[in-house]
């Protein structure tokens, strides 16, 4: 995104309805060829193909991961979801059938709670868990649905300059730009620039409102 001068795209949630409606999704892995996902980037939540990508059907969803930084000098600009930092591989906590797990885990022995002489054994039903994630997928982003009227501030726009009233829409890489808004069809997502100013770290940013 050209508005980003340092680090990665950021999001300041001024008024995002997903925080009230619960339209937050984090069950599908990013497609294997996606190396980086930045907050404020838009993706398709492609449930048919069991992946997050840029080409699926349906509405654009906004990437809005929890910012995790681990050094004192790091700020929001230093965070993005980078594939090499993640190693998820299964859709569930187990990822395989319990009959398979019996070969490596012994549930037959009694366990004892602290301070108790009465033992108990695990009653594990023979349930099959979902299959492993697709080859090459390792990260599962958190995405949110936006609605008309939503407002947020970001530098995740693929433009060098903007002014109030400019309309934006996601391009093929999920970043907002004017060209995509100009070619958008009826019913497609659109955002309008309501204010041009800066983020807390003094990088250029825009406040946006969804209008379609």
Can you say where each PLM-predicted feature lies in the sequence?
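Surface-exposed, low-hydrophobicity beta-strand/loop segments enriched in small/polar/acidic residues
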Residues: 1-212
């Amino acid at each position: 995104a050209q508005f980003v001068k340092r680090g990665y795209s950021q999001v300041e949630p001024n008024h995002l309805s997903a925080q009230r409606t619960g339209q937050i999704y984090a069950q599908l892995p990013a497609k294997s060829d996606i190396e980086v996902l930045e907050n404020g980037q838009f993706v398709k939540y492609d449930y048919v193909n069991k992946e997050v990508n840029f080409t699926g059907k349906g509405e654009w969803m906004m990437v809005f991961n929890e910012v995790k930084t681990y050094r004192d000098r790091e700020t929001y600009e230093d965070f993005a979801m980078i594939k090499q930092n993640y190693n998820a591989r299964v859709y569930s906590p187990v990822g395989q059938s319990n009959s398979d797990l019996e070969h490596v885990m012994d549930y037959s022995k009694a366990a004892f709670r602290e301070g108790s002489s009465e033992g108990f054994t695990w009653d594990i039903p023979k349930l099959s868990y979902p299959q492993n994630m697709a080859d090459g997928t390792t990260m599962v982003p958190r995405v949110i649905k936006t609605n008309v009227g939503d407002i947020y501030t970001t530098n995740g726009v693929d433009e060098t300059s903007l002014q109030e009233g400019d309309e934006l829409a996601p391009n093929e890489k999920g970043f907002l730009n004017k060209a995509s808004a100009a070619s958008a069809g009826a019913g497609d997502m659109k955002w309008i620039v309501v204010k041009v100013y800066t983020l807390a770290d003094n990088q250029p940013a825009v406040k946006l409102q969804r209008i379609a």
